[in-house]
């Protein structure tokens, strides 16, 4: 049975976790001599790109609208497809820019239809070793929706003990364009742009991607500027056209940024709670040492737009013998009193090296029953994509996995030649 080891005994001083500053990239960051892609830019970013190649400012509103439509409604891959854009401007655009998406390094499809893409971003400089940072995003098809789980950072700084991504060091923040491009890649793969041929999922009527959750790699509120701008692009009704009520941002509890998220993004909020006592949450979610449960829930009660129609989702991973007792369930109900909320119970998804086990199904059902009886919706999240490590808490970029394997080979006495052969095999 997995148990938590506490590093904050009652009465002891609460050490604050060091929060690593993530390197930034700008919207058009790229290596010298490499054309930047326009895919993922905001309206303002696209305007500045056009002005930069000589488009008169008086024409930019019309030109931005034209190019915007081709990128975000039609899913254009070449400027030559833009039939209502003049030949001269198309030539200028092609001389200076591309419509490239991030490279799809691998695509894995689970037995349940979940898809995971490993994406390599365009190289931007020394902080990604001129190779291009890699992230993962996941598409989860459902009966009445299709949810895309997107990443906001390369790696993560929070080191949550039950989360695979937390074992990968933080490399850098993703730009707005890199966040939006994950949705563009998904729509490409699914044939989900207007006028495209049906994708691998059969081209069902309506949009295949209906919901976005910022629950991939990284802490979104530590990259809030880019996340807010990405939500604006995703929800623009003349483009990707998602409803903001179908966009959910999950945070481990960066309390000072929560109000701004609600005011500027108007997105749905999810909280990675996972414990009802500070001493346990300090271990599971070390950020709790900086923003303990009382502060976090106070920020939730004051979240802009909070109502019964816009409830906060509290995520609670079920860990056997750690946080799954009847007493924990009753304490959870008491903590959330007065907050319009639902509680997502998440069966723990195992990953190599984890010290935890998933609660027994009977225990999960009992926990859910207690919460539901108290008046809170308490669905048990169906694990999706476990067989391809695409489920909640399992994402970790392939680059980091390969580096870890290389270190292990060297520690076992295998030479550099063997490591190189393994990496390129």
From Swiss-Prot:
Entry GO MF terms: 4 iron, 4 sulfur cluster binding; metal ion binding; rRNA (adenine(2503)-C2-)-methyltransferase activity; rRNA binding; tRNA (adenine(37)-C2)-methyltransferase activity; tRNA binding
Record: residues binding [4Fe-4S] cluster: 156, 160, 163
Biological process annotations from GO: rRNA base methylation; tRNA methylation
Residues annotated as the enzyme's active site: 136 (proton acceptor), 392 (s-methylcysteine intermediate)
Cofactor note as given: Binds 1 [4Fe-4S] cluster. The cluster is coordinated with 3 cysteines and an exchangeable S-adenosyl-L-methionine.
Listed cofactors: [4Fe-4S] cluster
Record key words, sorted: 4Fe-4S, Cytoplasm, Disulfide bond, Iron, Iron-sulfur, Metal-binding, Methyltransferase, rRNA processing, S-adenosyl-L-methionine, Transferase, tRNA processing
Gene3D superfamilies tied to this protein: 1.10.150.530, Aldolase class I
Iron-sulfur as UniProt keyword: yes
Catalytic activity: adenosine(2503) in 23S rRNA + 2 reduced [2Fe-2S]-[ferredoxin] + 2 S-adenosyl-L-methionine = 2-methyladenosine(2503) in 23S rRNA + 5'-deoxyadenosine + L-methionine + 2 oxidized [2Fe-2S]-[ferredoxin] + S-adenosyl-L-homocysteine; adenosine(37) in tRNA + 2 reduced [2Fe-2S]-[ferredoxin] + 2 S-adenosyl-L-methionine = 2-methyladenosine(37) in tRNA + 5'-deoxyadenosine + L-methionine + 2 oxidized [2Fe-2S]-[ferredoxin] + S-adenosyl-L-homocysteine
Location relative to the cell: Cytoplasm
EC numbers on record: 2.1.1.192
Stored PROSITE patterns: RADICAL_SAM
Keyword Glycosyltransferase annotated: no
Recorded GO CC terms: cytoplasm
NCBIfam families the record matches: rRNA_mod_RlmN
Known function: Specifically methylates position 2 of adenine 2503 in 23S rRNA and position 2 of adenine 37 in tRNAs. m2A2503 modification seems to play a crucial role in the proofreading step occurring at the peptidyl transferase center and thus would serve to optimize ribosomal fidelity.
Additional observations: Reaction proceeds by a ping-pong mechanism involving intermediate methylation of a conserved cysteine residue.
Family: Belongs to the radical SAM superfamily. RlmN family.
Name recorded for this polypeptide: Dual-specificity RNA methyltransferase RlmN
